[in-house]
Design a protein with these regions (language model features):
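Small-residue-centered hinge/linker elements
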Residues: 2-129, 139-235, 293-343
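Extended, non-catalytic substrate-recognition/exosite surfaces adjacent to catalytic cores, especially
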Residues: 115, 273-288, 292-301
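Glycine-rich beta-to-alpha transition loops that act as phosphate-gripper elements at the mouths
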Residues: 131-141, 254-257
Length: 343
């Protein structure tokens, strides 16, 4: 009975809102209501210091992927871009703290985030640039470091797992299993490389030069990663001067896919400071040249229409098994900036 009353009230509010919007289209002097593009955000105070200025915290957690994270179809990348845009447009926001706890993920998704951070700092598209300070949690490896590289200042804990600068791609070969069960594929293709990375081929069916082509692609994306590290750390050192850390001369020797502790990353110049989130906040205020600031975060807001969209789902819910751990969802043939320890 109570649930029925709640649903009736929600329905009445929704009908009233839609009616108001409909009438506004035909009322003189009223502007047309337009739904904003991108995720809807609410500003939430994490720490209210009754200050004039603000600093925004943007979280990057888990596997970095360009996948929808809610019923509205927006991806994690959309949400991060929207948060940066809100911080850019708010004159009271003087800096962003990028809180990273991620093993990395998809190459393109990581690059989209890196690009958004770089544009935020340089103030492209006619907007004023603002500093971004990265605060690494327990894990900021591979793509997690990639998105941190363009930040003006990077703080890591001594025990942070970072580094893992490199690219990985899986290609499974199951031809031996197919032979055991009596299966043999018939493939019709337009060129000898059209079924590149197909796992249904035997070793002698793989065309000469295919492995070299795949490795060339890996090396190209790997080179991009190293350029992002070199450019980001060089630009940061120019801004920070003697306060920051410069990459050591042989830094590429440590960019071979190995993981580094926060202490090692500091020693080789991959991070500027050893500390925690509070230290990153203090440094952000110093870089922004402010003595005090309110700490805020932009959280995604869901309105009544989103609620009814959820109730109106017609598809059956998927059955999910909780294994107690967050396993990377890696697909064969995809490029990843990802640290993926074998379990």
């Amino acid at each position: 009975m109570i649930l029925a009353i709640i649903l009736f009230v929600l329905l009445a509010v929704s009908v009233l809102a839609n009616f108001t919007q409909f009438v506004s289209h035909f009322t003189p002097g009223k502007s047309k209501m337009v739904r904003s593009v991108g995720p809807k955000l609410d500003e939430v105070y994490l720490e209210d210091n009754d200050a004039q200025y603000k600093m925004a915290v943007v979280d990057i957690r888990g596997i970095i992927a360009d996948q929808a994270i809610g019923q509205d179809g927006y991806t994690a990348i959309d949400l991060i871009k929207a948060q940066l845009k809100a911080a850019q447009e708010d004159r009271k926001v003087k800096a962003v703290i990028l809180r990273v706890d991620s093993p990395g993920g998809e190459v393109l998704a990581a690059d989209e985030i890196k690009r958004a951070i770089a544009e935020f700092e340089t103030g492209e598209k006619g907007k004023q640039g603002k500093p971004v300070i990265a605060s690494m949690g327990s894990l900021a490896a591979s793509g997690g470091y990639y998105v941190s590289a363009p930040c003006q200042w990077i703080v890591a804990n001594e025990m942070t797992i970072t580094g893992s600068i490199g690219v990985i791609m899986d290609a499974w070969n199951y031809r031996g299993l197919m032979d055991k069960v009596g299966l043999r594929p018939d493939v019709y293709k337009s060129g000898k490389f059209k079924d590149m990375l197909s796992g249904s081929r035997s070793t002698n069916e793989i065309p000469a030069g295919e492995r070299e082509m795949v490795q060339k692609l890996i090396d190209e994306v790997y080179g991009k990663f190293k350029n992002v590290v070199a450019d980001g750390r060089s630009a940061a050192h120019e801004k920070n001067g003697s306060e920051g850390k410069a990459l050591v001369g042989n830094w590429q020797d440590y960019a071979d896919g190995r993981v580094l502790s926060g202490s090692e990353a500091f020693q080789y110049g991959f991070v500027d400071q050893l500390g925690n989130f509070d230290d990153a906040v203090k440094k952000a205020k110093k870089i922004a040249n402010i003595s005090s600031a309110n700490l805020i975060q932009y959280q995604q807001r869901y309105d009544i229409s989103d609620l009814f969209h959820l109730f109106g789902k017609s598809q059956a819910p998927a059955i999910k098994v909780d294994l107690g751990m967050d396993l990377p969802k890696v697909e064969a043939g995809h490029l990843y900036y990802l640290w993926r320890p074998e379990k």
